[in-house]
Design a protein with these regions (language model features):
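Alpha-helical DNA-recognition elements
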Residues: 27, 38, 114
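Amphipathic C-terminal alpha-helical segment
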Residues: 70-71, 105, 110, 114, ...
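Amphipathic alpha-helical packing segments from all-alpha helical-bundle domains
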Residues: 73-74, 81, 90-118, 127-131, ...
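Helix-turn-helix
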Residues: 1-30, 34
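Conserved hydrophobic residue
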Residues: 4, 120-121
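Helix-loop "lid/cap" segments that line or gate small-molecule binding pockets
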Residues: 50, 65-73, 79-88, 166-171
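Short alpha-helical scaffolding segments that buttress acidic/His motifs in well-ordered protein cores
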Residues: 32-36, 65, 79-83, 133-137, ...
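Amphipathic alpha-helical linker/stalk segments
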Residues: 35-64, 73-74, 104
C-alpha cells in the first residue's frame, strides 16, 4: 500500500480497531517508525564485536557480508517508505543516541583493526575499507529497490562470495 495507506486499512489488515492503533502508537508517524525503523545496533553489527577469530578472513568476510546484505535488503525499502511518508531525517535520527550508520561504520572499522592485529589483513585505511564494504552492500540493496534487480544480475550468494574474494585479495597481508 505504501506510506499513504490509511490507518483504517492498517487496522483492518491487523484485525484490530483504528482506535487501538492510536491508543498504542499515538500518531501514524509513531506507528510507521515502530514498524519500519531498524534497530539502533543491528544483529550483524553486534556480531562484529565477537570477532574476528582465527579462521581465514575470506570465511569471516563472507559471514559479515551475508548478514549485512540481508539487513540492507530489508532496511533500504523500509527507509524509503519512512522518508516517503514525510518523516524528516532529523525526526528519524532523533530516535537514536548515535545514528545507526555511524555505529555500523565504527564497529566495522574496529573489526578490521582487530583483523590487522591478528595478522589476517594488512594495514590499510580502515575507514576507506569500511566505507567500501558498506557502500557495496547498500548500493546493491538500493539498486534492487529502485530497478527491481541487482545491477549484475548475479544471485545474492554469488555477490557475497565475489565481494568477499575481492576484499580478501585487496586486504591480504603483504608477503615478504
Amino acid at each position: 500500500h505504501g506510506p499513504g495507506v490509511s490507518t483504517e486499512v492498517i487496522a483492518e489488515a491487523l484485525e484490530i480497531s483504528q482506535p487501538a492503533i492510536f491508543k498504542r502508537f499515538g500518531t501514524k508517524k509513531d506507528l510507521m517508525l515502530a514498524a519500519l525503523l531498524p534497530p539502533s545496533v543491528p544483529a550483524w553489527v553486534s556480531a562484529l564485536e565477537d570477532g574476528p577469530d582465527e579462521r581465514p578472513i575470506v570465511e569471516q568476510l563472507r559471514e559479515v557480508i551475508r548478514q549485512a546484505a540481508a539487513f540492507f535488503a530489508e532496511t533500504i525499502p523500509a527507509m524509503s517508505v519512512i522518508r516517503a511518508s514525510g518523516i524528516s531525517k532529523e525526526e528519524l535520527l532523533a530516535s537514536f543516541e548515535v545514528a545507526p550508520p555511524v555505529v555500523a561504520k565504527r564497529t566495522l572499522i574496529a573489526w578490521l583493526l582487530r583483523s590487522k592485529e591478528g595478522g589476517l589483513i594488512r594495514p590499510v585505511d580502515f575507514e576507506a575499507a569500511a566505507t567500501m564494504i558498506l557502500g557495496a552492500l547498500q548500493f546493491r540493496a538500493f539498486m534492487v529497490q529502485i530497478v527491481g534487480d541487482a545491477p549484475s544480475g548475479a544471485p545474492d550468494e554469488d555477490y557475497v562470495d565475489d565481494l568477499a574474494d575481492l576484499l580478501t585479495h585487496g586486504l591480504a597481508p603483504e608477503v615478504g
